[in-house]
Swiss-Prot record:
This protein's name: Membrane protein insertase YidC
Annotated InterPro entries: Membr_insert_YidC (IPR019998), Membr_insert_YidC_N (IPR028053), YidC/ALB3/OXA1/COX18 (IPR001708), YidC/Oxa/ALB_C (IPR028055), YidC_ALB_C (IPR047196), YidC_periplasmic_sf (IPR038221)
Annotated spans, Disordered: 43-62
Bilayer topology annotation: Multi-pass membrane protein
Location in the cell: Cell inner membrane
Alphabetical list of NCBIfam families matching this protein: PRK01318.1-3, PRK01318.1-4, yidC_nterm, yidC_oxa1_cterm
Disulfide feature: none
Length: 563
């Protein structure tokens, strides 16, 4: 029985690890070279088929909507020097807006340092041509949209070049203005204290003699560079790619490979489009009541684009009209994302066991609210899970204890039957039946617990709360490997102790393989996040205590019965 249990554990570990690696090949970081593209002032959308056309609109501007026949033709407009950018700073966002088109081309997160040893250097989410190309674009296209005009994208003006949310100020509005042909445009950004989402609103004041019509578009544009927020070195990188919402599929991934194969087009009521990376997400969220055309594409420079175009906005002469969308750029906070739009919280990707992982994270959060330390919270959570599964674990340990008790009898059977495996198997089954031992008794409890353990793995790997979270002493970041490999070595030691408590396999080859397992697993765990290794150490330690207690209890009962 113990041999089967051992083989099952090893097989599950190997299959799980290989499965994770395969999942990352399909949905993880793209193994592509970084595209160091120069700063672009173009807006989102249609294919670059007319990229050389004279007197045409920007190459990135999409058609008005899925059914419109007024698609803009491309024109590359000159890049704007960084000195011309409009800088905006709140308590949680530090960003730059390009006056050409009004795109958000740089964005940093002051509360999230890029590295723990450099708390003064914030993590940079958007970057237009520095280390990578990643920006949020938006504009007005369609019949009269200024972003679809032959002269190129509009150049906005602002009253200031720098805006900062003052102490005691909860809301800040940044207005960019542009006028043409009797129509006055305001591109308004509204920021609020403590929020990573901002509202982008277009105000169209039509003072011309003609009716005005246009469509709002918004998109995220990114090159193929690797994930700058990824910290694992085990091959278990989380998903890097696009995602969107549909009524049939509230969380639909669109990987770079999917975009390489061709455009994805959807028509949705409300919805959202997003770009995901480890710990952080950026998303455009349109009007929930509007029917929006969502599409993805890859431009001629190798950039990946996902965006939407809203229904036509019509403004009569002498009237005003408004259209808006929300941009989120920040950490994967489930509570915040759920409030912004249905399904957006699923971008915290716990994999196919998300329905188990979410309650585990909820419990972990509540424990942290009491203890204030994520390391101790992991320990308490592990104890609670171990206690919950104690009846199942006890059944497994009892089965192993009985196997340990009959080990001398198994050795005697081996001497009697030698290399005759068939007779040996028959004799073993008769012995199990006589001693009332279930050969699968140690395996089934493990199978039941595996989904919970895998879910906890993804919770610890995916949750932004673990990023740069300290525990004690040398563990200053639970999301990266133990810098001195102390926890993995302790984990290997606990596996060795567990092995000593188990009955020795009758097959010498199996016994040799089992002796190697602590060394093999220690090697694997050297590069695992410290938070995950901490969980495994605590889990193994509790298992040793439970197993030792039950084994002593059964052995004492066996000796008493023998007397």
């Amino acid at each position: 029985m113990d041999i089967k249990r051992t083989i099952l554990i090893v097989a599950l570990a190997i299959v799980t690890y290989v499965g994770v690696l395969k999942w990352n090949q399909d949905y993880g970081q793209a193994a592509m070279p970084t595209q160091n593209v120069a700063a672009s002032t173009t807006a989102p959308g249609i294919p670059d088929t007319a990229a050389g056309t004279n007197g045409s609109a920007s190459a990135d501007v999409p058609s008005a909507n899925a059914t419109a026949n007024t698609a803009a033709a491309p024109l590359e407009t000159p890049a704007v020097a960084s000195k011309d950018l409009i800088h905006v700073k709140t308590d949680v966002l530090d960003l730059a807006i390009d006056p050409v088109g009004g795109d958000v081309v740089q964005l940093r997160l002051p509360l999230y340092p890029r590295r723990q040893d450099r708390p003064d250097v914030p993590f940079q989410l958007f970057d237009n041509g520095g280390e990578r190309t990643f920006l949020a674009q938006s504009g007005l296209t369609g019949t009269n949209g200024p972003d679809a005009r032959a002269a190129g994208r509009p150049v906005y003006t602002s009253t200031q070049k720098t805006y900062q949310l003052a102490d005691g100020q909860d809301t800040m509005v940044v207005d960019l203005k542009f006028s043409e042909n009797g129509v006055n445009y305001i591109k308004r950004f509204t920021f609020k204290r403590g929020l990573y989402d901002l509202v982008m609103t277009y105000v169209v004041d039509n003072q011309s003699a003609q009716p005005w019509s246009g469509n709002l578009f918004a998109q995220l544009k990114r090159d193929a560079s690797s994930d700058p927020s990824s910290t694992t070195a085990t091959g278990t990188a989380t998903y890097l790619g696009a995602a969107l919402w549909t009524a049939a599929e509230p969380y639909k991934k669109v990987s770079m490979k999917d975009i390489d194969k061709g455009q994805v087009k959807e028509t949705v009521q409300g919805g959202w489009v997003a770009w995901l990376q480890h710990y952080f997400v950026t998303a455009w969220i349109p009007d929930h009541n509007a029917t929006n055309a969502v599409q993805t594409r890859k431009d001629s420079q190798g950039n990946y684009i996902i965006g939407f175009t809203s229904p036509t906005l019509s403004v009569a002469p002498g009237a005003q009209g408004e259209t808006s969308a929300t941009l989120y750029a920040g950490p994967k906070s489930q509570a915040v994302l759920k409030e912004l739009s249905p399904g957006l919280e699923l971008t915290v990707d716990y994999g196919f066991l998300w329905f188990i992982a979410q309650p585990i994270f909820w419990l972990l959060q509540h424990i942290h609210a009491i203890l204030g330390n994520w390391g101790w919270s992991i320990i308490v959570l592990t104890m609670l899970i171990k206690g919950l599964f104690f009846p199942l674990s006890a059944a497994s340990y009892k089965s192993m204890a009985r196997m340990r008790a009959v080990a001398p009898k198994l050795a005697l059977l081996k001497e009697q039957h030698g290399d005759d495996r068939q007779k040996m198997s028959q004799a073993m089954m008769e012995l199990y039946k006589k001693e009332k031992i279930n050969p699968l008794g140690g395996c089934l409890p493990i199978l039941v617990q595996m989904p919970v353990f895998l879910s906890l793995y993804w919770v610890l790997l995916e949750s932004v709360e673990m990023r740069q979270a300290p525990w004690i002493l040398w563990i200053t970041d639970l999301s990266i490997k133990d810098p001195f490999f102390i926890l993995p070595i302790i984990m290997g030691a606990t596996m060795f102790i567990q092995q000593r408590l188990n009955p020795t396999p009758p097959d010498p080859m199996q016994a040799k393989v089992m002796k190697m397992m602590p060394i093999i697993f220690t090697f694997f765990f050297l590069w695992f996040p410290a938070g995950l290794v901490l969980y495994w150490v605590v889990n193994n330690t509790l298992s040793i205590a439970q197993q030792a207690y039950i084994t002593r209890k059964i052995e004492a009962a066996t000796k008493k019965a023998a007397v």
